[in-house]
């Protein structure tokens, strides 16, 4: 008898747990992706190059696999294409959400209409598509929403094209960028929700909803929404957690999700829970495939694959506990976490990479995932969640230890930039694009105070910048502030690190150096030193 197969959509890093779990469960892992060089292709038992949005091509291939390879189910995680899964899966009679429900959970205006119809808490919104996207329509909608509001592509993930609109001056260009990032040239404008944000994963199975992950999301850098990490499980108050779970369950019901994975990005606002979005799949961002398994001991991807293959997810059914949420739509359960897992990202200022230092994996660090950033490649301060430079994941019995270890590992990562690059110079100048006031932020808010200090003159070549700072009491006070930059170093640690890395630095203009450090952190400090050396060598 032919070994059973599952068809997995996507061959990137986020799909690696699915490919490995399928093989561990005894399935042939058949994988499709538009990119034959995707980083997890080598793990597949069989690979075919298919664009994940080509639903009819996926269906035809699935039909072939059903006839020839004993196909049992279709699956994805961490992609935009749960609708492609359901389109083929529904036609072939596999266990999955309906195609209509998957579309509801993919196309944001449809999602909002479902929530509206069922009184599910979510922000007020307007949507425009194609020729409807005019400056007049956009400005009228923005005026009705008031500031700040948010624009998103209707059908994209990873926060690509998503940003806050803080004034009329930012509105029209922001919407045009969002439209470019939409596969259907559709955008949604909505109220901004103020409050802490959370991610929830769940399995919908036989009329029950089982929570399989509830994490704190750490979102920064307005006007964009950059997730610098998440921590599993959340530290939220239990009463608030149950309210959020109940609202999530109402949203799952409103979308019509009945069989498979569901994930939510949700906030707790002054109005209570407000749903950002719900997807018909497991989460990406290292949550379902890494941090939840580390914290709970459950291979969630394997359990979701079992559901997709028409089998019982015994690994969650056996250990789940009932939750008393008062929800009328589902019997709700929870698979709680025993440990804490923290994921944190490291990021870069704009420039061109000269060299990379990747942090080592030392307990309790479980994984270090550098993004495909290469020497000679360009980097930028992220405007979406695809532009970060790498991630670390930890596991500990303590929330504080898991977070501390993740931050320490990130602080050890370093991208040295090529000297004398215009993008880096523009950033270090403290200037901003017209519609991005305040972005990218400075490494330290004290950057604005440096200009007013009387610190003219030169730091002698090879002289410790920390010792030099001792001669300037006001500068020393700024260095001793506890504020940390985006890679979890404070200003004092940054100066110490500079002294360690650049003991033979050239003579440095004192004001320019300290402005560069407070604006660009360690990268900025070393960049300005390297640029001085480069200029001297050219002379």
Regions flagged by a language model, labelled:
Residues 166-167, 202, 346-349, 392-398:
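Short beta-strand-to-loop capping motifs
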Residues 178-186, 191-233, 242-275, 279-288, ...:
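Phosphate-binding core of ATP-grasp and ATP-grasp-like enzymes
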Residues 40-41, 151-156, 223-225, 284, ...:
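Short, flexible turn/loop "capping" segments at secondary-structure junctions
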Residues 107-188, 194, 206, 231-246, ...:
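Active-site nucleotide/adenylate-binding loops and adjacent lid/helix of ATP-dependent enzymes
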Residues 1-101, 131-133, 312, 324-334, ...:
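ATP-binding N-terminal substructure of ATP-dependent carboxylate-amine bond-forming enzymes
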Residues 345-375:
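Glycine-rich active-site loop/lid that clamps phosphate-bearing ligands
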Residues 243-264, 279-354:
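Active-site "cap" helix and flanking loop/linker of ATP-utilizing ligase/carboxylase catalytic domains
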């Amino acid at each position: 008898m032919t070994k059973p197969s599952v068809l997995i959509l996507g061959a990137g890093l986020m799909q690696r747990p699915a490919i490995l779990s399928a093989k561990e469960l005894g399935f042939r892992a058949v994988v499709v992706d538009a990119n034959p060089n995707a980083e997890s292709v080598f793990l597949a038992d069989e690979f075919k190059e298919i664009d994940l949005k080509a639903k009819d091509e996926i269906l035809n291939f699935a039909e072939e696999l059903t006839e020839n390879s004993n196909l049992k189910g279709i699956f994805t995680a961490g992609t935009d294409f749960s609708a492609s899964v359901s389109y083929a899966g529904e036609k072939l009679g596999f266990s999955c959400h309906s195609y209509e429900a998957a579309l509801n959970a993919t196309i944001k205006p449809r999602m909002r209409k479902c929530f509206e119809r069922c009184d599910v808490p979510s922000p007020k919104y307007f949507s425009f598509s194609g020729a409807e996207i005019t400056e007049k329509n956009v400005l009228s909608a923005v005026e009705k929403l008031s500031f700040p509001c948010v624009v998103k592509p209707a059908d994209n993930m990873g926060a690509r094209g998503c940003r806050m609109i803080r004034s009329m001056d930012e509105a029209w260009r922001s919407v045009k960028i969002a439209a470019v990032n939409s596969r259907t040239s559709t955008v949604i404008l909505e109220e901004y929700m103020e409050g802490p944000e959370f991610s929830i994963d769940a399995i919908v199975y036989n009329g029950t909803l089982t929570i399989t992950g509830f994490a704190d999301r750490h979102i920064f850098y307005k006007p964009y929404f950059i997730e610098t990490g998440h921590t599993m499980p959340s530290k939220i108050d239990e009463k608030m957690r149950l309210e959020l779970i109940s609202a999530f369950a109402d949203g799952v019901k409103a979308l019509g999700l009945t069989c498979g994975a569901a994930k939510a990005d949700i906030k707790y606002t002054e109005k209570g829970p407000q749903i950002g979005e719900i997807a018909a799949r497991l989460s990406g961002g290292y949550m379902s495939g890494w941090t939840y398994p580390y914290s709970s001991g459950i291979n969630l991807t394997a359990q979701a694959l079992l559901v997709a293959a028409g089998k019982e997810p015994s690994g969650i059914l056996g250990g789940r506990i009932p939750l008393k949420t008062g929800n009328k739509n589902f019997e709700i359960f929870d698979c709680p976490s025993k440990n804490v897992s923290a994921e944190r990202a490291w990021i870069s200022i704009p420039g061109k990479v000269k060299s990379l230092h990747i942090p080592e994996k030392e307990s309790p660090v479980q994984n270090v995932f550098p993004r495909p950033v290469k020497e000679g490649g360009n980097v930028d301060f992220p405007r979406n969640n695809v532009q970060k430079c790498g991630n670390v994941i930890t596991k500990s019995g303590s929330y504080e230890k898991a977070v501390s270890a993740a931050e320490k590992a990130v602080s050890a990562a370093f991208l040295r930039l090529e000297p004398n690059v215009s993008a880096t110079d523009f950033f270090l100048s403290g200037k901003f694009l017209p519609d991005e006031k305040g972005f990218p932020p400075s490494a330290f808010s004290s950057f604005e105070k440096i200009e007013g200090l009387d610190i003219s003159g030169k730091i002698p070549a090879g002289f410790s910048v920390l010792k030099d700072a001792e001669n300037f009491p006001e500068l020393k006070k700024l260095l001793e502030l506890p504020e940390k930059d985006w890679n979890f170093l404070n200003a004092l640690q940054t100066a110490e690190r500079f002294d360690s890395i650049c003991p033979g630095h050239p003579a440095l203009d004192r004001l320019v150096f300290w402005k560069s450090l407070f604006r660009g952190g360690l990268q900025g400090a070393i960049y300005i030193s390297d640029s001085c050396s480069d200029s001297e060598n050219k002379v």
